[in-house]
Amino acid sequence: MGIDIERHHVKKSQRSKPASENVYLKLLVKLYRFLARRTDSRFNKAILKRLFQSKTNRPPISISKIAALTSRKSASSQNKTTVVVGTVTDDERMLTVPKLSIAALRFTKSARARILKAGGEVLTLDQLALRAPTGSNTVLVRGKKHAREAYRHFGFGPHKHKAPYVRSEGRKFERARGRRKSRAFKV
């Protein structure tokens, strides 16, 4: 007779593989699963976990944010390769791009062109695995998760200043009671 485990029919909550059917992503998962198992490196485990994540949990990061992060750190971290498990985007407000070494899942066309023009280097995650199998001389960064427009609406309640989902955005809609002091109360 078998033993009935307490959590018998309960699935594990964390992902063990990406939901996407993208073959290139699956190859990267295969590679980093091997590296996470064979090397005693927390870096590879972190990369693998992030490869499993949904697109909303892999937010983009701009080259201006990466430049700010690398310049703010000490001189030793300026020579490191910045690793992003997500998209690296361009920032037109940034007039001059410093020399950067970035490895990412993907780059926008303009971001790639500007990094290369500045004398920097653009790496894919499989090229990074050849160069730094244990993640040495790298710094792992990610974009802001709450920058999406949808986050403006989450957690609605009194005194939260969250944006309502409105039918229309005219003068008569969502502008009176509860939105201004002169009409009963303001949250």
Swiss-Prot record:
It comes from the Eukaryota. Keywords: Cytoplasm, Phosphoprotein, Ribonucleoprotein, Ribosomal protein. InterPro entries: Ribosomal_eL18 (IPR000039), Ribosomal_eL18/eL18-A/B/_CS (IPR021132), Ribosomal_uL15/eL18 (IPR021131), Ribosomal_uL15/eL18_sf (IPR036227). GO terms for biological process: cytoplasmic translation. One of its GO terms (molecular function) is RNA binding. The modification Phosphothreonine is found at T87, T89, T134, T138. The modification Phosphoserine is found at S16, S64, S136. One of its GO terms (cellular component) is cytosol. Its main location: cytoplasm. It is found in: Cytoplasm. The keyword Cytoplasm applies. Component of the large ribosomal subunit (LSU). Mature yeast ribosomes consist of a small (40S) and a large (60S) subunit. The 40S small subunit contains 1 molecule of ribosomal RNA (18S rRNA) and at least 33 different proteins. The large 60S subunit contains 3 rRNA molecules (25S, 5.8S and 5S rRNA) and at least 46 different proteins. eL18 interacts with NAP1. Component of the ribosome, a large ribonucleoprotein complex responsible for the synthesis of proteins in the cell. The small ribosomal subunit (SSU) binds messenger RNAs (mRNAs) and translates the encoded message by selecting cognate aminoacyl-transfer RNA (tRNA) molecules. The large subunit (LSU) contains the ribosomal catalytic site termed the peptidyl transferase center (PTC), which catalyzes the formation of peptide bonds, thereby polymerizing the amino acids delivered by tRNAs into a polypeptide chain. PANTHER family: 60S RIBOSOMAL PROTEIN L18 (PTHR10934), LARGE RIBOSOMAL SUBUNIT PROTEIN EL18 (PTHR10934:SF2). There are 2 genes for eL18 in S.pombe. Belongs to the eukaryotic ribosomal protein eL18 family. This is Large ribosomal subunit protein eL18A. It comes from Schizosaccharomyces pombe (strain 972 / ATCC 24843) (Fission yeast). The gene is rpl1801.
